[in-house]
Regions:
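Terminal domain-initiation and capping elements
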Residues: 1-363
Length: 363
């Protein structure tokens, strides 16, 4: 296996011209595309339709090349979009390809894909979703040809939140939901999928979990999960990244933990982890960085390093947007590239106030 990473600019959520150019130039083969992760310029909330628009645009393009329907494209390729390009964050997409290659003798970047069944509204944010995601993560782990959970550095999950239509459907059927607030369902949805990752990788014992734990007991978490929820999906899409001795190529992945949204040293440490170096963090070679994926979170109680912030009390701007803008600037100050995947909300993704970060580098 050889994984290719192609990061492209987007002028709007429907702009597929860069991918089309790569395909026409022979730099990307459509039948080798296995996943896409990107940022769109929506608000990231329950009424963010830029994500669905972007998926529709890319699936229409690829349908023409692959000779299948757009619907078949989305069943074959996970399209994971995070809405919200606040501050310096730039709308973009990272396309992942997978092809045959001889192992190098060293562990190299590997990718595994899995997609769950569709969920009923009453299953979102519950143990049912936890278990289904855990099973899918195990399948993605196998697909990535990784032998040890310690070699997994990043598990991206995108799943459904409760849209107004889903809430109404459950109401007609008398089904109980975790909440009837569409935006309020995001913590439950993100939390359940993150716990699914934690269970699959042995970070949390499933026997300790219950519906009452989700989005409440934050002492249960995964250190490598990066989960998002949107109204454009009814199932969960899992993209698992790690390093495998059965993979070829010249890419590696590493990860780290950001202590807060201004943790520059944490960014550098994640880059160093990917490079496999123990050098002084100030000497990290950022020119090797191919892609960065991180979560952003407001500080616990709104207090950042002893100083009060308004992230959690601002009635006009959601805290996730504050956090994405802050972390986007911090990471860009290190790498020099604002095309970063930064997603808000870290329920069961590292300890409260902390956040995961993963980096792919060329070696």
């Amino acid at each position: 296996m050889r994984v290719g990473v192609h990061k492209i600019r987007m002028n709007n959520p429907g702009d597929v011209s860069e991918l089309q150019r790569l395909i026409e130039a022979g730099e990307v083969k459509p039948d080798e595309i296995v996943a896409l992760i990107g940022k769109t310029e929506g608000n990231g909330g329950a009424n963010d339709f830029t994500r669905g628009f972007a998926t529709q645009s890319f699936s229409l393009l690829l349908a023409g090349y692959l000779g299948i329907s757009p619907e078949a494209v989305t069943q074959r390729i996970p399209f994971v979009w995070s809405g919200g390009t606040e501050g310096v964050l730039s709308p973009h997409a990272t396309i992942f390809t997978r092809s045959e290659a001889e192992p190098t003798g060293e562990k190299r970047l590997s990718i595994g894909i899995a997609i769950t069944r569709e969920f009923a509204p009453e299953e979102v944010g519950t143990m049912t979703e936890v278990r289904e995601v855990a099973e899918a993560v195990r399948a993605a782990f196998f697909d990535a040809a990784i032998d040890n959970a310690a070699d997994v550095h990043y598990v991206q999950v995108k799943g459904p939140l409760l849209t107004p239509a889903a809430v109404a459907d459950a109401g007609r059927r008398g089904a109980k939901l975790v909440t009837t607030d569409p935006n309020g369902s995001k913590p439950y949805a993100r939390g359940a999928t993150a716990l699914g990752v934690a269970v699959a990788l042995g970070e949390v014992d499933e026997a300790l979990l219950s519906d009452e734990v989700i989005a409440r007991r934050m002492d249960f978490y995964s250190s490598v999960a990066n989960t998002s929820a949107g109204g454009e999906l009814r199932n969960c899409e899992i993209i698992l990244f790690g390093n495998s001795s059965r993979a070829g190529g010249n890419l590696r992945i590493g990860h780290g933990i950001l202590k807060d949204v201004v943790d520059t040293d944490g960014v550098k440490a994640a880059i160093a982890d990917a490079l496999g170096t123990k050098a002084d963090q100030t000497a990290v070679d950022v020119s090797a960085v191919k892609a960065v994926f991180a979560k952003a979170e407001a500080p616990v109680g709104g207090v950042l390093r002893g100083a009060r912030t308004t992230m959690l009390s601002d009635a006009d701007i959601n805290y996730e947007r504050h956090a994405r803008a802050a972390l986007g600037a911090v990471i860009t100050s290190v790498t020099g590239d604002p095309r970063i995947f930064v997603s808000g909300g870290t329920e069961h993704q590292c300890k409260p106030g902390e956040a995961p970060i993963a980096v792919i580098v060329e070696i």
